[in-house]
């Protein structure tokens, strides 16, 4: 654990050299949750300054291709949340503005397939 132990975050991670955001998302979700996804579109981009480092968070709407049974590889817990439940967990500061927007305005349209 570290400074943010016990906080919630979107699954994902850093883009490696030679990857685009969609390739990075696929790799990270296989590494973290053992699922393959079909990235549909970028929903949001947020820049956040944690003081000691700056990050760009890219939220991508996607459908699950395989691995419907999610395996927690790098995380302790996972939850599906309804719009009403979005703010019920302790989100990392970079993620919170996106969740507050979805809580107030509604979730992005999810892909049907």
Question: Which residue ranges define each predicted feature?
Answer:
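Nudix hydrolase/Nudix homology domain
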Residues: 69-113
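Short secondary-structure junctions
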Residues: 32-39
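Surface-exposed, flexible loop/turn segments at secondary-structure boundaries
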Residues: 1, 48, 86
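A generic fold-level signal
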Residues: 2-3, 52-54, 73, 93
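A general structural signal for well-ordered alpha-helical segments in protein cores
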Residues: 22, 56-57, 95, 99
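Active-site-adjacent beta-strand/loop module that shapes the phosphate/pyrophosphate-binding cleft
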Residues: 36, 45-69, 77-79, 83, ...
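Conserved Nudix-box catalytic region and its N-terminal flanking loop in Nudix hydrolases
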Residues: 1-31
């Amino acid at each position: 654990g570290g400074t943010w132990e016990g906080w919630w975050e979107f699954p994902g991670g850093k883009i490696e050299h030679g990857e685009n955001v969609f390739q990075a998302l696929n790799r990270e979700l296989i590494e973290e949750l053992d699922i393959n996804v079909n990235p549909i579109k970028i929903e949001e981009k947020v820049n956040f300054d944690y003081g000691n480092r700056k990050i760009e968070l890219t939220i991508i709407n996607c459908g699950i291709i395989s691995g419907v049974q999610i395996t927690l590889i790098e995380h302790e817990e996972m939850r599906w949340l309804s719009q009403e439940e979005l703010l019920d967990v302790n989100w990392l500061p970079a993620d919170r503005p996106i969740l507050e927007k979805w809580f107030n305005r509604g979730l992005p349209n999810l892909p049907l397939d």
